[in-house]
Amino acid sequence: MKLKPIYDKIVVKRMEEKEQKTPSGIIIPDTAKEKPQVGEVIAVGNGKVLNNGEIRPLAVNVGDKVLFNKYAGTEVELDGEKYLVMAEDEVLAIIE
């Protein structure tokens, strides 16, 4: 199955974080860590519909690495993989 976002929506896959340890060597389990706020754009919609009816292409593209708010988007699971579906305006920055 494949997710195809509509309008100004995008699909983002969170970047995996490396295992974290405290300075004393204690490993922090995944359940205690905050989810990363960086991800890769997997799919984009066809554009944002403006008030005059025109469609403006999105500023983000497939493959872009993006920074987003920790509460951004809706998490969905597809074929065992977790993705975020969010509006383009929830993206704070493109990381170059």
UniProtKB/Swiss-Prot annotation:
Organism encoding this protein: Hydrogenobaculum sp. (strain Y04AAS1)
Q: Which family does it belong to?
A: Belongs to the GroES chaperonin family.
Show the GO cellular component annotation of the record. cytoplasm
Question: Which CDD domains does this chain map to?
Answer: cpn10 (cd00320)
Q: Principal place where this protein is found?
A: cytoplasm
**Database matches in NCBIfam families:** PRK00364.1-2, PRK00364.2-2, PRK00364.2-4, PRK00364.2-5
Lineage, top-rank taxon, reads Bacteria
Q: What biological process terms from GO does the record include?
A: chaperone cofactor-dependent protein refolding
Q: Which Gene3D superfamilies match?
A: GroES chaperonin
The protein's name: Co-chaperonin GroES
Write out the annotated subcellular location.
Cytoplasm
The family database entries (Pfam families) matched by this protein are listed as: Cpn10
What assembly does the database describe for this protein?
Heptamer of 7 subunits arranged in a ring. Interacts with the chaperonin GroEL.
